[in-house]
Amino acid sequence: MQYTEIMVRYGELSTKGKNRKNFIDRLGFNVRESLHSFENLVIKAHRDRMHIQLHGEDYEAVMKRLKQVFGIQNFSPSIKVERDIEKVKVTAVEMVKEKFKEGMTFKINTRRSDHNYQYDTNEMNDILGSHILREVPGIKVKMKNPDMTLRCEVRADGIYLSHEKIDGAGGLPVGTAGKAMLMLSGGIDSPVAGYLAMKRGVDIEMVHFFSPPYTSEQALNKAKDLTAKLTPYVGKIRFIQVPFTEIQETVKEKVPSGYLMTIQRRFMLRLTEAIAQRRKGLAIFNGEALGQVASQTLESMAAINDVTTMPILRPVVSMDKNEIIKIAQDIDTFDLSIMPFEDCCTIFAPPAPKTKPRIDKARYYEERLDVDALVQRALDGIEITEIKIGDTFLNQEKKVFAELL
């Protein structure tokens, strides 16, 4: 069957009232970004539907990409037919015959946005249903839970036929809920947190701390590849790498080992907040899950959060590890996340970090450091990479070797 377009139905946008146009415009932008490699597509976003005209493009490849765009409730590969009822009847029979199996049941579901068309909804249902019963021997009508629902949408520019309704990603279009920074490590949790943030419409930029020579170029590229795994949901994501070596060496030299993790993460939060302010971010997301490690107790979170007034959002905070892993597998970040490259959170990890650090002690130990100067030098060294769909950074030979370790 040669489909001519994909009809997209919106998700939560129907609840957005006066802001609906802004949401639809943003969804249209995101769909164009996600599908930019399909050169022949024509995308038209209307108030109640989006129409993606295929013009010969592979509809299955387009739909695979569409499944990852937030803000879409569902979509259907469709055939546009002239408003000639005889041509509609012929096409309807062809669509049913292609999927027909002995004993199959069906119904017709007509939706009419053009009320000037010569046949109303019930008449269209009767005309098409009767014709299919005559032309497809063995098929039966069933109004509740049929094997196939043939959808017919009557519009001013034509009649659209479809028989599949494929679930989209749901959520809200990325960018409709503002911008935030995601503290991206190389682990399992933070990419999942980023995915969940984007699902609620947040435009995220990745902030990744690296500490050469203690962390390798491959570890940095792994974080970039994790970012690339999330680009199909939005089209492109900015990756901000922050040099962290001097801060870690200084903290290790001047702070008791039990507070190393706390002070390091306070610096990370200061830096992320400063980057967010520069880049008009409204919040910070991270992958902390309560109680997983020493830095993720409530006492640790309070001691670390002490350095900022910016909202810190933790989408996976109440999830079990298995729940997080399931999402990571679904979004295809898990296998990459468990590759054994070192990151700056582990290279100077103390043998017995404080699980209940005190805010007053954290402040006291920081008095030994020139905090402002350390932060400024790190900010001066940041690099920003725009990562697009299909980008890869990890050296494949080294990647294979790492998987064998």
Curated annotation (Swiss-Prot):
An annotated GO BP: thiamine biosynthetic process
Name of one Pfam family that matches: THUMP
SMART domains in UniProt: THUMP
Subcellular location: Cytoplasm
Superkingdom per UniProt: Bacteria
Keywords: ATP-binding, Cytoplasm, Nucleotide-binding, RNA-binding, Thiamine biosynthesis, Transferase, tRNA-binding
GO molecular function: ATP binding; CCA tRNA nucleotidyltransferase activity; tRNA binding; tRNA-uracil-4 sulfurtransferase activity
Assigned GO CC terms: cytosol
Keyword RNA-binding: yes
Pathway: Cofactor biosynthesis; thiamine diphosphate biosynthesis
Record field: catalytic activity: [ThiI sulfur-carrier protein]-S-sulfanyl-L-cysteine + a uridine in tRNA + 2 reduced [2Fe-2S]-[ferredoxin] + ATP + H(+) = [ThiI sulfur-carrier protein]-L-cysteine + a 4-thiouridine in tRNA + 2 oxidized [2Fe-2S]-[ferredoxin] + AMP + diphosphate; [ThiS sulfur-carrier protein]-C-terminal Gly-Gly-AMP + S-sulfanyl-L-cysteinyl-[cysteine desulfurase] + AH2 = [ThiS sulfur-carrier protein]-C-terminal-Gly-aminoethanethioate + L-cysteinyl-[cysteine desulfurase] + A + AMP + 2 H(+)
Cited PROSITE patterns: THUMP
Function: Catalyzes the ATP-dependent transfer of a sulfur to tRNA to produce 4-thiouridine in position 8 of tRNAs, which functions as a near-UV photosensor. Also catalyzes the transfer of sulfur to the sulfur carrier protein ThiS, forming ThiS-thiocarboxylate. This is a step in the synthesis of thiazole, in the thiamine biosynthesis pathway. The sulfur is donated as persulfide by IscS.
Cited HAMAP family: ThiI
Identification of the protein by name: Probable tRNA sulfurtransferase
Organism the protein comes from: Ligilactobacillus salivarius (strain UCC118)
Gene: thiI
